[in-house]
Structure formats: C-alpha cells, structure tokens
C-alpha cells in the first residue's frame, strides 16, 4: 500500500513538469528543451537553501523562481535575439548543466538533517490519517500524497483562472497565431517570455518537491524530464480526447500519474531500469501515432 501511495505521490509531483510542458507546447506551440535544466535548477536551488537553514517554503519558492528565470532566458534568446526555438532551449539547458553543478557545489547533496515541506506536511496532516486507523508510516505517506495533490490542484486552478482572463486569453491567442497577434499590435515577445517563465517555474517547482521527497538533489536528475512531460501530455490527451483548457490541464496531470503507474508496473514486471528512458520514448511515440491509426480506421469503416 505504501508503494502504491508513493507512486501516486511521485507521479503527482512530476505532473507539475507535465503542466509546464502543456503551457509551453500546447498553449504557446513552443518546443521548450529547457525543461531538463530547469527541473534540476529548481531541485538544486531548493536543496542549497534548505541546507543553509532557509525556511522550506521560501526555499521551494526560490527554486521555482530560478526556473522561471531560466525560461525567461530561453524566451529572450528566441524572441529578442532571433535564436531558433529548439536551439535557444538547447543553449540554455547546456549552460544550466554548469550552473547547476556550480550552485550545488558537487554532484549530489543529501537533505538529511533538514526540514522539508513534505516533512512539515507529514507532521501536520499525518496525525489526521493516523486517527483513521492507519499505521504511522502509511499515514505519513498519505499526508505527503495529500500535500502534493493540493499543490497540483492549486497549480491547475491558478492556470485555469489566469488563462481565462483577458491577458491570459491574449497570450493563448498569441501562441496559436503569432502572426495575427503581431498584426493586432500584441507584444508576442513579451507573451512568450511570460509563458516560458510560467512553464519553467512549474517545472522547477516539481524539481524542488521531488528533491525534498527523495531526500537529495542531484545534477543529473533532470535528464529526460522533457520527454516525461511530453509523454504525460499526450497520454492524458489520449485518455480523454479533445477537451477545453480546464479538461486539458486535469488530463495532463492524470497522464503523469498514469504514466508513473505504468512505469512502476513495468519495473515490477522485470523491466531493466536501463531501458526505462527508451520505454518512455516508445510511449510518447505510441501516443503520437495511435490517434492517426484510429482516425484512419474510423474513416475506413465509414466508407
């Protein structure tokens, strides 16, 4: 039972990465490779602040802000210096590999002896679950799950609210049709900057939470996060089909949890962990290709 709850918690923490990819890719049509670097940056900054005795909330927000700055850098390279989108993300991610190592000071920093947000959640919410008859270990994991679920729910609510405002709607329109937005006098560069700041801030928040959940930060922990995010977005879309903004956000989070459950099941079935990244790529490919075959099949049946 603890393993299942842990899988849910980890999947929800990574759902913030998926939401970031949803914002950059779905809403702004921006294939942002910065995700890998900003995830690690959020974890690294939060870990350094925590080990320095900083308040867990401030440390987590600091990691989130650092990720937002990374997204701004990618947007600046593209929108104001004319660097192609993929190349801008690659350049920033490459630079962040050095930045993360310098900030962390070494390749891995344990968080033992520090008080994290999840420790506080366990201390505050855990007794509530214990009163239902759960063991202390199970109640602690349930408390961590409830906390991360609350963070993801709040993120979805804030994104849904913001992108339905006049400014948010204009940003979405600029992402869909930038040429028309420029013709209407919209500052598409500023919109891209804000969008990538939000996307990478969410990704860095995920990194900060994952580091606190795992109990350490590592300079390699962000490798493959952009693929995880894409897999979650496409898997969520495959699960629910075409939906509006709110449904898309919820489906993306559900896709992350579902994907984490699939990964856990595959590992328990004997999948070599060395093949995990390759399996992730296959899932993304399947989610991309399957709808086309289903569409062809439906057309064939109707003709």
PLM regions and their residue ranges:
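Membrane-interfacial amphipathic/re-entrant helices at transmembrane-helix boundaries
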Residues: 1-18, 25, 45, 53-59, ...
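Single transmembrane alpha-helix segments in multi-pass membrane proteins
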Residues: 3-61, 76-82, 234-246, 266, ...
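Loop-to-transmembrane alpha-helix initiation sites
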Residues: 10, 85-87, 112, 144-148, ...
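Alpha-helical transmembrane segments within multi-pass membrane transporters and channels
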Residues: 21, 54-99, 153, 254-255, ...
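Helix-loop-helix "hairpin" substructures at the membrane interface of multi-pass membrane proteins
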Residues: 55, 70, 140-218
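Transmembrane helix-bundle core of multi-pass membrane transporters
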Residues: 85, 89-92, 96-164, 194, ...
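Cytosolic-side transmembrane-helix boundaries in multi-pass membrane proteins
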Residues: 158, 176-190, 243-247, 262-303
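Transmembrane alpha-helical segments in multi-pass inner-membrane proteins
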Residues: 200-278
């Amino acid at each position: 039972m603890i393993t299942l709850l842990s899988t849910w918690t980890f999947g929800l923490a990574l759902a913030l990465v998926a939401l970031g990819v949803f914002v950059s890719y779905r809403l702004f049509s921006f294939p942002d490779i910065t995700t890998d670097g900003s995830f690690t940056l959020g974890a690294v900054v939060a870990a350094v602040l925590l080990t320095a005795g900083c308040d867990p909330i401030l440390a987590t927000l600091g990691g989130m802000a650092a990720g937002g700055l990374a997204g701004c850098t990618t947007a600046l390279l593209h929108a104001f210096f004319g660097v192609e989108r993929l190349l801008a993300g690659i350049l920033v991610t490459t630079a962040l590999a050095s930045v993360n190592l310098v900030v962390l000071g070494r390749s891995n920093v344990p968080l033992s002896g520090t008080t994290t947000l999840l420790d506080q959640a366990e201390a505050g919410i855990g007794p509530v679950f214990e009163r239902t008859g759960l063991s202390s270990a199970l109640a602690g994991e349930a408390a961590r799950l409830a906390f991360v679920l609350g963070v993801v729910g709040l993120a979805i609510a804030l994104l849904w609210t913001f992108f339905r405002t006049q400014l948010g709607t204009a940003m979405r329109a600029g992402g869909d049709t930038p040429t028309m937005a420029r013709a209407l006098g919209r500052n598409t560069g500023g919109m891209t900057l804000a969008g990538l700041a939000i996307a990478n801030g969410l990704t860095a928040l995920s990194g900060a939470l994952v580091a606190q959940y795992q109990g350490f930060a590592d300079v390699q922990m962000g490798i493959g996060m952009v693929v995880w995010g894409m897999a979650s977005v496409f898997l969520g879309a495959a699960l629910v089909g075409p939906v509006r903004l709110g449904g898309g956000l919820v489906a993306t989070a559900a896709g992350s949890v579902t994907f984490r459950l699939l990964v856990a099941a595959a590992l328990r079935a004997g999948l070599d962990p060395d093949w995990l990244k390759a399996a992730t790529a296959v899932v993304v490919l399947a989610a991309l290709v399957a709808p086309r075959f289903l569409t062809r099949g439906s057309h064939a049946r109707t003709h």
